[in-house]
């Protein structure tokens, strides 16, 4: 075991000693700051605290007339860590993280929808009431399903995770179907009044795919010709197809008849 190096902890005392001895003309600007906020004197580094995951549930307890709020604690599994990762800070985890992971695993295309991340005051979540899925001023997305499922788990008595997921998902599908119908009806009404729309995203994608296919077909033909020419340079030129498949003329080649 080597000795402790306390040079960094005594940097202020060193600066004051050098000023008193006349080695420096004036003190550095950080001397007063380090005097007000000194560095830590603890030489032993403790491991980060392992936080517990607390869940709120409403359950009907035996002997109770009304459902009561119960806080469930889930102990984290302690995994052996490497020495280099022993003092890393603990990851911050919430209950809705797992709910969000399951929803987007079942609905991966929801991540492709555009999202609005700008908030008016930064506290828009305080005005949301997740007793219903659709919120005023918020676009319907996967996060709405996650928050709705979490509200059901925290407020409905004896609610299970799968049942809350089915309820929130059913409401989400119904609202999405309603949005699609409204969008289709609005487009039909606009076309009836003379509006014209350009190609859809699907049509644009198909056109780009066709162009790419035609470009690839031309490239494939050129590559095939290059390969044939390269093979012919090593094996010799092949006979034309007309000479190879020329039929034998029976009239020119007559067998003499015997007398």
UniProtKB/Swiss-Prot annotation:
InterPro entries: Ribosomal_mS23_fun (IPR016939). One of its GO terms (molecular function) is structural constituent of ribosome. Residues 230-259 are annotated as: Disordered. Residues 230-244 have a biased composition (Polar residues). Keywords: Mitochondrion, Ribonucleoprotein, Ribosomal protein. It is found in: Mitochondrion. The keyword Metal-binding does not apply. GO terms for cellular component: mitochondrial small ribosomal subunit. Belongs to the mitochondrion-specific ribosomal protein mS23 family. Component of the mitochondrial small ribosomal subunit. This is Small ribosomal subunit protein mS23. The lineage of its organism: Eukaryota, Fungi, Dikarya, Ascomycota, Pezizomycotina. The gene is rsm25.
């Amino acid at each position: 075991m080597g000795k402790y190096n306390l040079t960094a902890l005594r940097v202020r005392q060193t600066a004051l000693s050098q000023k008193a001895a006349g080695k420096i003309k004036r003190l550095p600007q950080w001397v007063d700051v380090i005097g007000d906020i000194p560095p830590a004197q603890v030489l032993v580094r403790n491991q980060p605290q392992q936080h517990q995951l607390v869940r709120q549930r409403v359950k009907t307890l035996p002997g109770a007339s009304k459902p009561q709020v119960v806080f469930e604690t889930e102990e984290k599994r302690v995994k052996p860590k490497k020495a280099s990762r022993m003092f890393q800070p603990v990851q911050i985890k919430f209950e809705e993280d797992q709910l969000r992971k399951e929803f987007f695993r079942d609905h991966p295309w929801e991540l492709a929808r555009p999202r609005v991340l700008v908030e008016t005051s930064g506290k828009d979540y305080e005005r949301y009431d997740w007793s219903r899925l659709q919120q005023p001023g918020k676009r319907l997305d996967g996060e709405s399903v996650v928050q709705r499922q979490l509200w059901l788990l925290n407020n409905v008595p004896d609610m299970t995770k799968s049942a809350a997921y089915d309820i929130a998902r059913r409401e989400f599908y119904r609202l999405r179907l309603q949005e699609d119908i409204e969008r289709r009806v609005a487009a039909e009404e606009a076309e009836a009044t003379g509006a014209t729309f350009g190609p859809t995203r699907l049509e644009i994608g198909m056109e780009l795919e066709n162009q790419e296919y035609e470009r690839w077909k031309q490239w494939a033909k050129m590559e095939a010709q290059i390969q044939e020419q390269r093979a012919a340079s090593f094996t010799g030129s092949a006979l034309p197809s007309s000479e190879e498949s020329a039929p034998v003329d029976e009239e020119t080649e007559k067998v003499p008849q015997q007398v």
